Amino acid sequence: MKNTTAMADYELRHIEALRKDLAGCTVLLKKDGSFPLEKPCTLAAYGSGVRRTIRGGTGSGEVNSRYIVTIEEGLQQAGFTLTGMEWHTGYEQAREKAHKAFLKQLKKDAKAAKQNFILYGMGKVMPEPEYDLPLNAEGDAAIYVVSRISGEGNDRTPLKGDIRLTDSEVRDILALDKKFTRFMLVLNVGGVVDLSPVMGVRNILLLSQLGVETGGALADILLGKANPSGKLTTTWAAFEEYPEMPDFEDMNETRYREGIYVGYRYFDTFRKKALFPFGYGLSYTEFRLGTAEVEANGAQVTVRTTVENTGTMAGRQVVQVYLSKPAGKLDAPRQELCAFAKTRTLAPGEAETVICSFTLPEMAAYDAETAAYILETGDYLVRVGVSCAETVPAAVLHLGKTVTTLQAKNVLGSTDFTDLTAPAAAMERPEGVPVIEIDPASIVCETIDYARTEEILPEVNALTKEDAALLLIGDFDPNAKGLASMIGTAGRHVCGAAGESCSTVKGISWLIMADGPAGLRLAKEYYEDGKGKHAVGNALMPDSIMEMLSGPMKLVMSLMGGNGKPKAGCEIKTQYCTAIPIGTALAQSFDTDFVQRCGDIVGEEMEHFGVHLWLAPALNIHRSIRCGRNFEYYSEDPLVSGKMAAAMTRGVQAHKGCGTTIKHYAANNKEYNRTRNNSMVSERAMREIYLKGFGICVRESQPKAVMTSYNLLNGTHTAESRGLVMDILRAEFGYQGIVMTDWVTPMTGDARSAHRDSQAQYVAAAGGDLFMPGNKGDYDNLLQGIDSGAVTLEQVKINASRVVKMARALTQE
């Protein structure tokens, strides 16, 4: 059989474009001046991540790239001589033993939960094992690479081997730091690890998970060919310092008692100790910020400051602007990020004037009593710095009276608790800081028309009830049952694609959708015959799931995902896609231009393979470091999240016929029983924290699609919430695209839970356009809803019209 395995031009270009900017996603947490190294040398390399390098998380976030450069490979390719390889042989033996026991227990747990083992196993990760192996390798320098992986379907635990370091890791890291003059602790992780036992280590690099060139990027950093310039988008602290979340593991209800005090808003306001604060990050070089100048033109605020490289190596710095608001009727965090900007690469001695801007209405607080966004009278302190812990007062903006910036309405339900509130604290004006008067009349109150007229296309109006309903359900096989009914028909036209919209209504185009927030996720190889395109091997399940299955089950999944092995003589075609950095790493760059270039990479590959909608980016908030899917998400801060999602969307949608699907809308901040868990969140916290990033992304980039989340919000499934979908998303944010559900809702909820799954008829009634990936049961449910009056045929045709218009726009009819 002929196999076209030579790397395609797009692969080479994309990998080259990525690698030169990857150091910008990494965060130098500690340094003593002993790095970078002058040249490749003999390097003692320890830790699971040297050989088992993690490029990204598990689940829908996995990307089928042609290869990954491990840290071992990247260092060897850069000319290093690695020692300590016998350590890895011993580690693999310890890991294999632990993994067998892990799988055995997993099968027992799936049976107890009455869940399909494949779906139950999604995201389940074995903790790092303990071991006792000698550290007898010599070298001019040494590294220890801590790796952690997490994923869709399961949350992290505060146990050793996950959020906490194992005893073995702590012992070896401290021993190596003592033994070697030049030692670097490298963190190949997607989320926070409690580093409190090893804070004495002199050099720590958060490498993160950078996609295909993860190993090469580390080699560049160790040799000084690239300089880390990332900043933390999540507060790193000892586990005990985070807000208590006693019901995080509750099957049915999750109460967001901390309200708006998420991440640094909590740590700063309540004076909690962070190991490394939000916005923090060092460089091989040093920078000095000049005195900031602040101007206000009505509600528009502009901040200018000069950044000078005072060190000996070229590098980049991130300027961060924070706003401290007066506490009046509403309590307020100590400070909130309101703008940021990254310098270009500055040579030693070079300086750049950086300009950041924001508007005061963007920083308004939500008053649930009056259902309005307000700016209260008082002083607003503008702070400028390089992290939330390193800011300098730059100006006081004084507002003479309270103003309303947007009159909304409460639509998200209520909770059975009162949000955490901050103690009242008077803000004193810093001496020597200019005071700028803000004219209240310059801030205009925005009003919203919630009674919007929706269009029904003539061709949709002419459809039968049955055909109109089909357009709201993903393409499904009416004869398939069980798991195959949802995923057995995925990717009819593009092998390995997640699924498609309905392709059986005459004269209506369909949309092809693909997963993979860290790149496009398609089948690696396929072939064509008279019956169509067929994936070679398994195209349905990520590698992280396949490794859990027995031999016979792997064969079954392979046959479902493709057609097994192709006949002799068939040409094997490839669909290798580029694995970009995980969402958190992208955000750590604080570089929206780079993120947009990553979107351009994805968009070009979508065009190349014929994919219309990318089921990404994901911009949920890092509410808790325990969320297993945080690696996909950008930050604990909504401004960072929204700006990054907008940049990614602009990059993708610059390509003809390509769109993003921003997700998961909203309050999807844990994975355990995610399809039937009720997030209980106040209207204020939802609007100021969990919805704000979506609003930024919609207003700045108009993504083609929005995906609702699995969970309920205050007792109503998000996909069934007309307040979320129509009132806030469409009316307040001005959204113009289509709304789909998250995928494979049936069969994924714990049978012991108190809440049901979302249903197609109620999703349609709320204004949801697509129930994905769809099966006959969902279709029948929608028809039943039309007949019972749960949803009107008019609403169904309104939703269907949006789907048809989007399909035409992206298929270029």
Give the location of each predicted region.
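Extracellular/periplasmic metallocenter environments
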Residues: 371
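Glycoside hydrolase catalytic-domain context in secreted enzymes
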Residues: 1-365, 374-390, 407-813
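Short beta-strand elements
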Residues: 390-407
